[in-house]
């Protein structure tokens, strides 16, 4: 299983990557999550401009057998939705690169302290 060291993780199997500008971040689901869900057929997110609080549901992922909520790892505002999600299977094939869900404008960087490192996430999922 792929667990990139440069990302932070939640217990709900989302990842977040702060971009070089330091004010925005990409959010998606982990390789573990996509493998547990199986073949993803549809992804729906809230629209650009939606304000999120940590743990808010910002969308859903529909797989052949189940539907799962997507949870915001931090407070922020959705500033972009990944258009590649129109082909939802990209989440299975590239969860950390092409399959990101939303880009958020960050509000409080101190919230990162509550997120897990790659090593902590790996331990949580038993890798």
UniProtKB/Swiss-Prot annotation:
Superkingdom field: Bacteria
Quaternary organization: The glycine cleavage system is composed of four proteins: P, T, L and H.
PROSITE patterns cross-referenced by the UniProt entry: BIOTINYL_LIPOYL, LIPOYL
Function (record text): The glycine cleavage system catalyzes the degradation of glycine. The H protein shuttles the methylamine group of glycine from the P protein to the T protein.
The protein's name in its UniProt record: Glycine cleavage system H protein
InterPro entries attached to this UniProt entry: 2-oxoA_DH_lipoyl-BS, Biotin_lipoyl, GCV_H, GCV_H/Fam206, GCV_H_sub, Single_hybrid_motif
Entry keyword Flavoprotein: no
Modified residues (N6-lipoyllysine): 65
Keyword Cytoplasm in record: no
Keywords of this entry: Lipoyl
Cofactor(s) this protein cannot do without: (R)-lipoate
GO BP, sorted A to Z: glycine decarboxylation via glycine cleavage system
Note describing how the cofactor binds: Binds 1 lipoyl cofactor covalently.
Domain spans labelled Lipoyl-binding: 24-105
PANTHER family: GLYCINE CLEAVAGE SYSTEM H PROTEIN, GLYCINE CLEAVAGE SYSTEM H PROTEIN-RELATED
GO cellular component, one term: glycine cleavage complex
Family, per entry: Belongs to the GcvH family.
């Amino acid at each position: 299983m792929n667990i990139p060291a440069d990302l932070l993780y939640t217990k709900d199997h989302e990842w977040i990557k702060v971009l070089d500008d330091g004010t925005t971040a990409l959010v998606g689901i982990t390789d573990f999550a996509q493998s547990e869900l199986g073949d993803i057929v549809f992804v729906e997110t809230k629209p650009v401009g939606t304000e999120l609080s940590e743990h808010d549901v910002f969308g859903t992922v529909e797989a052949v057998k189940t539907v799962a909520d997507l949870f915001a790892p931090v407070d922020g505002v959705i500033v972009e939705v990944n258009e590649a999600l129109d082909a939802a299977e990209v989440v299975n094939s590239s969860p950390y690169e092409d399959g990101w869900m939303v880009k958020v404008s960050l509000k409080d960087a101190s919230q990162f302290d509550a997120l897990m490192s790659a090593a902590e996430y790996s331990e949580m999922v038993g890798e």
